[in-house]
Amino acid sequence: MSLPDIHRVQSFFLSLQDSICHAIENIDQKATFQQDNWQREAGGGGRTRMLTQGAIFEQAGVNFSHVYGDALPASATAHRPELSGRRFQAMGVSLVIHPLNPYIPTSHANVRFFIAEKEGEDPVWWFGGGFDLTPYYGFEEDVIHWHKVAKSVCDPFSQDYYARYKKWCDDYFYLKHRNEPRGVGGLFFDDLNTPDFDHCFEFVQHVGQGYLDAYLPIVEKRKSIPWGERERQFQLYRRGRYVEFNLVWDRGTLFGLQSGGRTESILMSMPPLVRFAYDYRPEPNTPEAKLYTDFLIHKEWV
């Protein structure tokens, strides 16, 4: 059985951050990422990259972090008592892209690696990650393309990965207090450590690289659609759901804040502008209403 190689994982994560930032800058043509290197007092650090006020992207955050410590926070050991008393390392790349044009969806991707070690015992390790899409105005062909790429990433590794991780994504990115999916899903997986390290690491590399294949063609197709105040106001309203999910339900946000992570980097996923409206309901049969009836539903897209 192949042993975990932390240095290989870190090298891939750093190069993935580079390639995604380069691709986003290339398509935006106006704004560039600003890098913020940071250190964590309790151990580790990272590099946060933010692009703001671009021609295509209102805000894009692509974060690499590598944190370590002698003991895990409560959020990590609550479901895994076997991790108590182990030193840990957690590293990953996390990104959220908020476009300016409401016809381009928001996208999120994440790949991460976790290892907990104790003298005289085998390490406990796993990978997690995925990518998901949050449209404001739905286009069926875009969602089908997104899920086709997700399936093509999974199929070489296991014929049941796509169905399993698609369902996990639908279940995870769900606002229980709204009884509503956050978007149209994609892939989400966690605790991946079988059959061995090499298999899992190769899959995670495919997920990380597959994100751009899934997202950029949608951006190219929708970036020139004209939009006005009506579309902008709906986009700002729907962005509120992103805020609600991240602050109420997201385990990564909770883990980051509880483990003494860097707050600015953890909350970089927040949209730059948001609008909340009391008891808003879209007019029936409008494009806004169709988002709810045709897209924010559990559906097999491919």
UniProtKB/Swiss-Prot annotation:
Pathway as given in its UniProt record: Porphyrin-containing compound metabolism; protoporphyrin-IX biosynthesis; protoporphyrinogen-IX from coproporphyrinogen-III (O2 route): step 1/1
EC number(s) per entry: 1.3.3.3
Requisite cofactors: a divalent metal cation
Compartment annotation: Cytoplasm
Keywords, comma-separated and alphabetical: Cytoplasm, Heme biosynthesis, Metal-binding, Oxidoreductase, Porphyrin biosynthesis
Protein residues bound to a divalent metal cation: H98, H108, H147, H177
Pfam families (alphabetical): Coprogen_oxidas (PF01218)
Any GO BP annotation: protoporphyrinogen IX biosynthetic process
SUPFAM superfamilies linked to this entry: Coproporphyrinogen III oxidase
Catalytic residues of the enzyme: H108 (proton donor)
Residue positions binding substrate: S94, N110, V111, R112, G260, G261, R262
InterPro entries: Coprogen_oxidase_aer, Coprogen_oxidase_aer_sf, Coprogen_oxidase_CS
Annotated site, Important for dimerization, chain positions: H177
Transmembrane spans: none
Stretch list, region Important for dimerization: 242-277
GO cellular component, one term: cytoplasm
Reactions catalysed according to its record: coproporphyrinogen III + O2 + 2 H(+) = protoporphyrinogen IX + 2 CO2 + 2 H2O
Domain of life: Bacteria
Annotated GO MF terms: coproporphyrinogen oxidase activity; metal ion binding; protein homodimerization activity
Regions annotated as coiled coil: none
Main location: cytoplasm
Function: Involved in the heme biosynthesis. Catalyzes the aerobic oxidative decarboxylation of propionate groups of rings A and B of coproporphyrinogen-III to yield the vinyl groups in protoporphyrinogen-IX.
NCBIfam families: PRK05330.1 (NF003727)
Assembly and binders: Homodimer.
Family: Belongs to the aerobic coproporphyrinogen-III oxidase family.
Identification of the protein by name: Oxygen-dependent coproporphyrinogen-III oxidase
Lineage start: Bacteria, Pseudomonadati, Pseudomonadota, Gammaproteobacteria, Enterobacterales
UniProt gene name: hemF
